[in-house]
Amino acid sequence: MISRLTEKPFVSVSLKMGTVPGGKVMKGTFLVLALAFSTLAAASPNGGPLGDFEAHGDIGSPKIGGYSTWNAASQVYTLSAGGVNIWAKRDEFQFAYRKMKGDFIVQAQVEFQGKGTDPHRKAGVMVRTSIADFDSPYVDGALHGDGLVSLQYRKAKGEDTAQVEMPAAKAATVIQLERRGSLFVLSAARLGEPFEIAQIDNLPNVPEEAFVGLFLSSHNVDVKETVVFRHVRVIKPVKVGFTPYRDYIGSRLEIVNVASGHRNVVYSSKVPFEAPNWLPDGSALLYNASGGDPTSRGRLWRFDIATRLPTLIDTGFAIRNNNDHVLSFDGQQIAISDQSQDKNQSTIYTLPTAGGVPKRITPLTPSYMHGWTPDAKWLIYTGGRIPKGGKDNEYDIYKAASDGSGKEINLTGSPGLDDGPEVSPDGKWIYFNSTRSGQMQIWRMGLDGKNVERVTSDDKWNDWFPHFSPDGKWITIISYGLEVEPSNHPYYKHCMLRIMPTDGSAAPRVIAYIYGGQGTINVPSWSPDGTHVAFVSNSDAL
């Protein structure tokens, strides 16, 4: 729901690569999705011949020349290089780069090809003052052939390289280098685990505008090595001091395979959008636009998988939709949360998925839609209500008949925020997130609000928005670090998209490391065959 501050270790879970945590494929759906993904692979936002990078070349004149390529269909970068090393006073390596000014985030999954000759071959992400000098100041996040991960840097031209080793991240597969003003932060993890962090500050010889990109060095002048970079995300973060719900940056629509963690960007826009819902036939995703001009902002859009084009959905007078919109299980209806009336307070309406005249369901506001029951008779939502004798809204979970009849029924009343309710596909449970323990964690209860049980017990993360796989065996959640206040889920933060069994029998594992948060995955977004999840990440224009 809308933020209340305004208006509103890889653990095995019996899920092996190639298996499907989602159960039975709906008739006709698998073919639609297979064709769709083959089409979507070519839908990357990276427009140039080298994707998000502007050029490539060898630094330091290595004996064996290298190259960099970008495969737009698979969204994969491949680098091949020789080079003595990136160390001491001389660097020799292949570099795919772009010039960037100010803060940035570059994330990549790194895969060396073959066993390699030297255990210290290295690849990763770098920011560098000069591409002409072999002894330039730089900072990099380096993955070595023997699994060593280190934050390496040269403070001044001609000086020796220094490094901070990260033993806890040994054999990492995901590297992320970030600049925050004068601070450089390296995050590294084996896919599935949370990041380990190292950082270095005060490197004045790495200027505000510098060369940023991917690198490879073979660590042997007579050998050429090759590395593949997958899931590369070049991100321009939001400016320091931005005002939430007024200042926005662009959005990327991504789809991740929940078994392998393989993810693709299928659409990107400078006009921000949020919260994708997947149609049951797999043909399209629905989302709301949160920015842009009045003809876009607050409107619902249908993103066609085959054409990769969004079209406007007619929602009548309801043209101030927020990111709490949910399809019925059969896909025939959509319940929206709109702020066009009632003094801009969020109100729940239903209408046909194809568009039409909204029917008001909740007489009381604010109300934020989150779940249908499988029989489409009830809506489950978060409501802000002023308790007897109180002055401020308390946010609890309610249900109301989907035809608008009768009074709403209050299901929770514990101190703190209860939010994000979603009904299991068998109709027996409501999963939700709550701060009743002091942190934001996942809980569940019966449809009558009884038999409340805790699902997650994370002491390092605040967990939000449980979403069920179609067979009800899995949930995805989005997790914030403890630096974020538990009852808040802000925009433009480092988050993790995680998956776990619905019964809590195994710990969550990471399937995507995201720069996003609010609007990333507020509503159900599993593919109908249970193999993929759609979500939104964010970046300003590069």
Show the residue positions of the predicted features.
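Serine residues within intrinsically disordered or low-complexity segments
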Residues: 3, 12-14
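Sequence signature of WD/YWTD-type beta-propeller architectures
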Residues: 239-542
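Short, Lys/Arg-enriched N-terminal segments with co-localized hydrophobic residues
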Residues: 14-25
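Extracellular glycan-recognition regions
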Residues: 44-243
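Bacterial N-terminal signal peptides
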Residues: 29-39
